């Protein structure tokens, strides 16, 4: 006949099984849709005045104004727990009520604080800004369309013709009245300056080969150009 060993009593060294969450913490009520966050409160708002305001929407389980631990002054926000979800919905129907003479903001606590106005903070996205405002703020320069006379370096005449000039070419001659007041002797004091005759010999001539075809056709019919013929170089005679 076999003898069964007696059951051992649990000693202090062995861990005991954990109790059920309901037995340890009790039955905790879900306040997801009943707890309300109240922000923007004035500093003189107390728990009693906060409760008095929300009593008009239904039964209240708790109304607390958060205060600073060191100074004991209000931090400007609090929490109100309503008895049921319907009362919380009625309390949040007005998102910006007047509490104790100041405009506050009310929303469910799990959703967080709601902004007072859509124009504050970063409520406006960058995509909604006007393009001109983005260019001024972020330094984005607009695209410019340059005229052909600026893009092409070979063109020597501006894109828009000057009304005061009859010809697109400006000829500087020694007989010009603007330069007649300067005597030729004034150029002799600079050893490396070109004489007026030498400068006039290069300025007064034009080269039709370098003029584009479009500009040559746009010139007036009465305008004539002086053809410059380069001197023929003769080889040195052998002696």
Curated annotation (Swiss-Prot):
Coiled coil: none annotated. Induction: By p53/TP53 family. Directly induced by p53/TP53, TP63/p63 and TP73/p73. It comes from the Eukaryota. GO terms for molecular function: mRNA 3'-UTR binding; mRNA binding; RNA binding. Keywords: Cell cycle, Cytoplasm, Differentiation, Host-virus interaction, mRNA processing, mRNA splicing, Nucleus, RNA-binding. It is found in: Cytoplasm, Cytosol; Nucleus. GO terms for cellular component: cytosol; nucleus. Residues 34-111 form the RRM domain. InterPro entries: Nucleotide-bd_a/b_plait_sf, RBD_domain_sf, RNA-binding_reg, RRM_dom. One of its GO terms (biological process) is cell differentiation. PANTHER family: GEO13361P1-RELATED, RNA-BINDING PROTEIN 38. Belongs to the RBM38 family. RNA-binding protein that specifically bind the 3'-UTR of CDKN1A transcripts, leading to maintain the stability of CDKN1A transcripts, thereby acting as a mediator of the p53/TP53 family to regulate CDKN1A. CDKN1A is a cyclin-dependent kinase inhibitor transcriptionally regulated by the p53/TP53 family to induce cell cycle arrest. Isoform 1, but not isoform 2, has the ability to induce cell cycle arrest in G1 and maintain the stability of CDKN1A transcripts induced by p53/TP53. Also acts as a mRNA splicing factor. This is RNA-binding protein 38.
């Amino acid at each position: 006949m076999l003898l069964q060993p007696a059951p051992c009593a649990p000693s202090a060294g062995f861990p005991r099984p954990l109790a059920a969450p309901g037995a340890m913490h009790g039955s905790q009520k879900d306040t997801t849709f009943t707890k309300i966050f109240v922000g923007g409160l004035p500093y003189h708002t107390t728990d009693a005045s906060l409760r008095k305001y929300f009593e008009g929407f239904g039964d209240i389980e708790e109304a607390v104004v958060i205060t600073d631990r060191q100074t004991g002054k209000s931090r400007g926000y609090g929490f109100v727990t309503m008895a049921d979800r319907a009362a919380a919905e009625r309390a949040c129907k007005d998102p910006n009520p007047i509490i104790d003479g100041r405009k506050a903001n009310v929303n469910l606590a799990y959703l967080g604080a709601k902004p007072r106005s859509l124009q504050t903070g970063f409520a406006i996205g960058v995509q909604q800004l006007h393009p001109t405002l983005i260019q001024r703020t972020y330094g984005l320069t607009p695209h410019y369309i340059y005229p052909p006379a600026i893009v092409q370096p070979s063109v020597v005449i501006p894109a828009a013709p000057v009304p005061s000039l009859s010809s697109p070419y400006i000829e500087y001659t020694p007989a010009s009245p603007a330069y007649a007041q300067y005597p030729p002797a004034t150029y002799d004091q600079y050893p490396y300056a070109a004489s007026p005759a030498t400068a006039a010999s290069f300025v007064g001539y034009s080269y039709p080969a370098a003029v584009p075809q479009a500009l040559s056709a746009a010139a007036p019919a009465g305008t004539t150009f002086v053809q410059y013929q380069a001197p023929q170089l003769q080889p040195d005679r052998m002696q």
